[in-house]
Amino acid sequence: MNGDFQLKSKVYLTGAGPGDPGLITLKAIDCLKKARVVIYDRLVNPELLKYARPDAEILYAGKASKKHSLTQDKINRLIVKKAKEGKTVVRLKGGDPFLFGRGAEEALELAKNKIPFEVIPGISSALAVAAYAGIPL
């Protein structure tokens, strides 16, 4: 592996919003358009994957109760592996990556491996539901 992978790769821990494809942020769409790898969760609306580059590697890493496609540890290692290959990676998570999304664990793993990353916030369903219902928080 090339020791200067940090110069070529970056990971975007990206919130996909609460499910409505119209609620993803423009910055998240921009990240999807440039990523060579997209690792997405179960709660991500699959329609959002249309924003990925045609040649992007799309990997499912969904988890449901007692039914994981990958454990969190394996997801962390996968993100690190793809970044060390010199690829721009979007870790696409339902809602916001740091609100019930285990984004902090992934960020710690990236920091431990000295891999540059950026957090792209997403609209959480905890906020969106109240707004849709007209209930102020």
Predicted regions and their residues:
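Flexible active-site lid/hinge loop adjacent to a nucleotide/diphosphate
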Residues: 22
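Short, glycine-/small-residue-rich phosphate/pyrophosphate-handling segment
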Residues: 134-137
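Class I S-adenosyl-L-methionine
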Residues: 1-16, 26-123, 128
